[in-house]
Amino acid sequence: TGYFYEAVDGSKREFWESEKIDARAVEGTDKSIYQQIINEYGEDSDEARVEVYGDFPKSGQDQFIAPHLVDDAVARPLYKDPTAPVVVGVDPARGGMDSTVIVVRQGRDIVAIRRFKGEDTMAVVGHVIDAIDEYKPTLTVIDEGGLGYGILDRLTEQRYKVKGVNFGSKSKTPLMWGNKRAEMWGAMRDWLKTASIPLDRGLKNDLIGPTKKPDSKGTIFLEGKKEMKARGLASPDAADALAVTFAFPVA
């Protein structure tokens, strides 16, 4: 990740002329050494990609979502399946530099991403209602942490079909995922393998930002927002808004 990756393979590649050089094509190198790397680690391993092909690794060692998954999803055309259910996901801001983000997903497409800063509870309620009225979702899901509970309560009172999700609650598969947030991100990662998403740098940075944190039993947790901010990364608001669209099954 970072600017160098963006300049070669990412969102800034159109501004730079770059070339990847296979080490085996360089005069004077010992080809047998590079073949040994391929034989030992596999031809599609990160070791071979970096040491032999002059390419980027598929992901950082602890990165939960690899950049190539996101880039591939950006490159795919929209499916535009009108029969697929529409789900609206809402990640309310917790103050500071965070944004409230509303994501509208229909099947394998992201239909819309809307961001709002500095909005109070009732203003966010209004934005969610606007999205519901426009896209007619089967379900709207809200992260009920922070401002979320008040937003959820107000929308429920007005008889909108909404559900809240607690990121720290128990996963349906607790041996695999440490909490509901990790479970939703796991479902989102699987979805990205065939999805179509817009070219949105903020969304990409959010998706590839968090690291995975397995415990001693191998159960996966995700890096928290405070830990990400300590590393100089923004809160992954757009990715969390997309993730909540996978919280509950929809017909």
Q: What is each PLM-predicted segment?
A:
Residues 103-105, 242:
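Conserved hydrophobic/aromatic positions in well-ordered beta-strands
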Residues 83, 94-101:
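Short, flexible loop/turn motifs enriched in small residues
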Residues 1-7, 19-21, 39-60, 145, ...:
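ATP-hydrolysis module of ASCE/P-loop NTPase motor domains
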